[in-house]
Amino acid sequence: MESKTYYATTTKRFILRTKHQDWLVETQIFYNEILAFYYNLYLKMSDFHEEGGQRVMRELEKLTIVGRDKQEVLYPLPWCKVPLYFRRAAINAAIAAGKSYLSRDEQQQRTQTFTKSVTFYKGMYRNLNEKSVELKVWSGEMWTWLHCRISGNVFSKGEEQLSPSVVLKEKQAELHVPVKSVVSDGRKAKLRIQDQEKIAAVQFINRDRLAVIAILDAKGNQCAVHFLKGGTVYERQCQKILTAIEKSEKATGYEESHHSNKKYWMKLKHLNEYYSHKFSKDIVEYCNEQQAGILVLPLYSKTYTKYVMNAVGNWSVLHLSGQIREKLKYKAWKSGIIVLETEAAGISSKCAVCGQKIQKNGTEYICKEGHRGSRYLNSAVNLGRKCLKSFEKQAV
């Protein structure tokens, strides 16, 4: 029996240049008009709401597109000669938007207008490489092929390119290309535990030492430890920008400075992106060095997470840890490491050596038996062992 092949999908961003930027704008406007049409139709048809995406698409097309039998349809599409795959991309986006609206606890007013980026399905783009791409676009009068130059990234060997999207930003256009690559190891966690693989348990410290990674063997013994540094550098750079924003607001007033400070807010966003990518990459690389096949993260309640995140603000090291977690999930998977989340309850209150209750003193701890050390490392070890025990219970 052949083993199953597993894949990871990530998105690569390119800067896109063309002589006809206005055609890209026209194409996006047209795309969103079609999207809005199908969004409202989908919400109107309550019978479709529990169906899968492909089934819903077929039903929506039956209601809007005249078939080979030339029979009239109930809701004819109010535009002529819309390319098949352009229409289907808009329908898929409309279904996703409709399902999102219906899933909200409190359904507010429906979206009236959309500004979604255009996804170009097969047949709507061609000759995609690292330097250029041809896109089928709407000029405002006709459909035409538009040659575009792209730069700023590369495709790796073995990657399969999927349907790209054109993202229009204030100062530039970007081409976002999803790429699919084979994952070296896609085994489930249970099999990895059975194969006695090491696990890496992460506890976020949210100081200069941003996180601690404890490597445990299959029996829960600590094999190695690594402290990830850099939190102070990140906070210092963020604070420098926030100070500049504060000075600008005092000098010109909030309303006037809000627009002029946009470049500063973008710098903060880019800092967050850069460091969350960097630190998540560092964690994955350390796991690979230690041959750990499972990465364990602490899981907190949504209420607790929301409360804490609101209290610390968007540019703290603690808030950065949330971005690191999200990036770890796909970076680790791409590297053949599986990510698990284990309930954090109880991991910080007992000694990992003897199980006695601990007393905290800053970043350190001490227990009744005299064991002492980093309370964050102690929590990481407890987290890893708690994860291992959960698999023992499953095996019983």
Language-model features: locations:
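Intrinsically disordered or highly flexible coil/loop and linker segments, enriched in small
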Residues: 40, 44, 103-104, 289-293, ...
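Positively charged, helix-rich recognition surfaces that bind polyanionic ligands
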Residues: 176-396
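Generic hydrophobic, helix-prone segments enriched in Leu/Val/Ile
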Residues: 8, 34-38, 60-61, 124-126, ...
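Stable alpha-helical structural segments in soluble proteins, enriched in small hydrophobic residues
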Residues: 30, 34, 89-101, 377-387
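Acidic carboxylate diad motif detector
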Residues: 57-172, 180-182, 226
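Gly/serine-rich nucleotide phosphate-binding loop at the start of the catalytic core
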Residues: 1-92
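Short alpha-helical "patches" and their helix-cap loops
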Residues: 48-55, 107-116, 299, 396
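Broad gene-expression machinery/nucleic-acid interaction feature
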Residues: 11, 130-134, 145, 172-174, ...
